[in-house]
UniProtKB/Swiss-Prot annotation:
Extracellular side: 55-72, 140-156
Annotated protein name in UniProt: CASP-like protein UU2
Stored InterPro entries: CASP_dom
Lineage of source species: Eukaryota, Viridiplantae, Streptophyta, Embryophyta, Tracheophyta
Natural source organism: Selaginella moellendorffii (Spikemoss)
Annotated GO CC locations: plasma membrane
Cytoplasmic membrane side: 1-33, 94-118, 178-183
Heme in keyword set: no
Major location category of this protein: membrane
Intracellular or extracellular location(s): Cell membrane
Keyword Transmembrane helix annotated: yes
Length: 183
């Protein structure tokens, strides 16, 4: 009988103000897997984009500067996405919410880096797309069609990486505003 009273007293205690409620955690945790999925997509798309473009750049012996720019931006975007993916996975595994364990400085830095990566990716993709269209490499005589199709595939994946970066930028902007409003 005493044992049942002890068990019921454990469950009758009011919730602690220091421990987030289950409802709050359920509202936050759906966003963490979303950001992890976006980071995975960023990494995969930017990896494919820069590896295909590096192959194209090797074929033209590095003579076209916008292809070099696209490869460089792809490498930077891929490295940034991998670093953010690692940190996001660490936060999800650790069980941190968007406000616990993440400093406001990190929120600012993530938002700024996401924005910069987004703009750099669309800049690199548009520079390469313009080059493919204007340079005459993809002429009507059929020469360079393999080069053109690979370049087009790389631009497509760079654009998909841009979409993933912009979606994660929206989420990190949400986290930043939420962090600012709590302060």
């Amino acid at each position: 009988m005493e044992e049942s009273q002890q068990q019921s007293s454990k469950f009758d205690a009011p919730p602690s103000p220091y421990v987030p409620s289950r409802v709050y955690l359920a509202q936050i945790y759906w966003k963490k897997p979303a950001i992890v999925v976006l980071r995975v997509l960023q990494f995969i798309f930017s990896l494919i984009a820069f590896s295909v473009m590096a192959d194209v750049l090797h074929d033209v012996q590095g003579s076209i500067k916008s292809l070099s720019y696209t490869v460089a931006i792809g490498v930077l975007a891929c490295a940034y996405a991998l670093a953010q993916l690692s940190f996001s996975l660490w936060c999800v595994i650790r069980g941190a919410t968007s406000s616990a364990g993440v400093t406001p400085l990190y929120q600012y830095a993530t938002f700024i880096c996401d924005q910069m990566s987004t703009y750099f990716l669309i800049s690199a993709a548009s520079a390469t797309a313009t080059l493919i269209d204007v340079s005459g490499v993809c002429g009507s005589n059929g020469s360079g069609t393999n080069l053109c199709s690979r370049s087009t595939a790389s631009v497509t994946f760079a654009f998909l990486a841009f979409l993933a970066f912009s979606a994660s930028s929206v989420l990190t902007g949400y986290y930043l505003v939420k962090c600012i409003l709590k302060a």
